[in-house]
Amino acid sequence: MSRYGLQKLYINGAYTDSTSGDTFDAVNPANGECIAQLQAANAQDVDKAVAAAKQGQPVWAAMTAMERSRILRRAVDILRDRNDELAAIETADTGKPLSETRSVDIVTGADVLEYYAGLIPALEGQQIPLRGSAFVYTRREPLGVVAGIGAWNYPLQIALWKSAPALAAGNAMIFKPSEVTSLTALKLAGIYTEAGLPAGVFNVLTGSGDQVGQMLTEHPGIAKVSFTGGIASGKKVMANAAGSTLKDVTMELGGKSPLIIFADADLDKAADIAMMANFYSSGQVCTNGTRVFVPQALQAAFEQKIVERVKRIHIGDPSDERTNFGPLVSFQHRDSVMRYIDSGKREGATLLIGGYSLTEGALAHGAYVAPTVFTHCRDDMQIVREEIFGPVMSILSYQSEEEVIRRANDTEYGLAAGVVTQDLNRAHRVIHQLQAGICWINTWGESAPEMPVGGYKHSGVGRENGISTLEHYTQIKSIQVELSSFNSVF
């Protein structure tokens, strides 16, 4: 018997057997052990979830703003009370160190839910005077039933990023977590019900993206899809959504983000920022600053500081509190990252440190890849052009500000960017020219609930978090009122 046993779908406020009874395994990437069996949804299950959501959504939307706010706040309290329990599940499912999941994953997800719970009473329309006898007023009404499709790197946080604004606006959601990391989304569903969310308002369907995800994007009963994943999958989502019922779509599709270090930067601080921008969560963060641009004159000194810091990384069992670098999320993903590393070697980049999978001792049965740093990289190399989503840093040298801005923007992605400098005039001047939706100056990675998150170019459509996201889960109804007589031309 696996640690977490058989995991059912969550439909209409209860854990429910799938129609087919088919299952797939959840695997701990730290040791290869099966930790749960998850039921796989099919078309009938999708229809059941949509029907339940359509029944529950009007009940939820009819509640007062304060009633809905109190229910979501209760869910926040439960999440925080169970932080350690949920963190342990997340660590077993993703391989992320417990030191991360305890302090970041559940905490930041709960923060987003609390933020939107507080905004519910502020969701209001407008009154627009036309003339003495007439005016217009607007109402922000829910879209109805919406779908969220999550990625595998921040399972619970992403489930909350998608469900919090959707529920706050009065919608019902059907959420499909990544088939690689599904466990905490199922836990979240139970927490919402325990907090008082009406049956059918939050449903979880586990299974593959090619099947369940596609069914959700094509389903005529769904009004909006919020998707996090890769570009190729995102294009399919958009095509399916447009080809079915012209659904609204929000997508976050990853990046190949530049981190620019200027000559006046504190080099120790710059090295610390580069480490966090590349090796946090074993490099499995969509906003990672994997293209690190350094002035040619400082390149050798910067490389030395990076190598010193990489050697201090504590790689090990993610359940060990001392570990700050765990395995990749799956063995399949480990192999993908290793192919990129091999590509970097073949194309002539200089390997400073790492560049291999860890296969000895206690790490032998896990999906571990050593933190890897390449230097003397060229802009046309595969490791510089493509998103690796692993612990691989590419160091590139440059000569001038104009040159580095041009090269930083020379990518199909546009999710994030950052600069490290003591010259604030330069910082703002450069940031204003970088083609990225999320930018940091002298820091990296923090994303508060108030901060809109999303990309330029192929990195996405729309935004998550912030006030505007709540508005995008509503539709505006305009009503004109005439207080005097009506004159007809007939």
From Swiss-Prot:
Under the heading Pfam families, the entry gives: Aldedh
Sorted alphabetically, the keyword list is: Metal-binding, NAD, NADP, Oxidation, Oxidoreductase, Potassium
Name the residues that bind K(+) 1: D93, V180
Gene3D superfamilies given in the database record: Aldehyde Dehydrogenase, Chain A, domain 1, Aldehyde Dehydrogenase, Chain A, domain 2
Any idea which positions bind NAD(+)? Answer: G150, A151, W152, K176, P177, S178, E179, G230, I231, A232, S233, G254, C286, E387
* One term of GO molecular function: betaine-aldehyde dehydrogenase (NAD+) activity
Its top-level enzyme class, in one word, is oxidoreductase
The GO biological-process annotations, alphabetized, read as: glycine betaine biosynthetic process from choline
Cofactor(s) this protein cannot do without = K(+)
Binding annotation for K(+) 2: L246, K457, G460
The note on the cofactor says: Binds 2 potassium ions per subunit.
Recorded hits in InterPro entries, A to Z, give: Ald_DH/histidinol_DH, Ald_DH_C, Ald_DH_CS_CYS, Ald_DH_CS_GLU, Ald_DH_N, Aldehyde_DH_dom, BADH
Catalyzed reactions:
betaine aldehyde + NAD(+) + H2O = glycine betaine + NADH + 2 H(+)
Q: Which domain of life is it from?
A: Bacteria
Q: Where is this site: Seems to be a necessary countercharge to the potassium cations?
A: D248
The entry's function note states: Involved in the biosynthesis of the osmoprotectant glycine betaine. Catalyzes the irreversible oxidation of betaine aldehyde to the corresponding acid.
Q: Which family does it belong to?
A: Belongs to the aldehyde dehydrogenase family.
Partners and quaternary state?
Answer: Dimer of dimers.
Name assigned to this protein:
Betaine aldehyde dehydrogenase
Q: Which organism is it from?
A: Yersinia pseudotuberculosis serotype IB (strain PB1/+)
Gene for this protein? Answer: betB
